[in-house]
Amino acid sequence: MPAGGEIFIEFVIQGNFVKATAIDGASGVEASVVGPASAPQAALADAARRKLEYVLKKKTSPSLKGP
């Protein structure tokens, strides 16, 4: 992820679960994680942010792409 890049975090409560979505402000790429509603928002946001970083890396690195 580029330094100073903007990441938006969205939380959607769905019953006993929360969906946290991290969105890259520059590219619009999204990554989501789901966890229990009792989980701290900071933990879900961190997991979504890490997943977004992985997805962005996967898009640019041929070694991480599947067959």
Region locations from a protein language model:
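Amphipathic, hydrophobic secondary-structure cores in small proteins
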Residues: 2-59
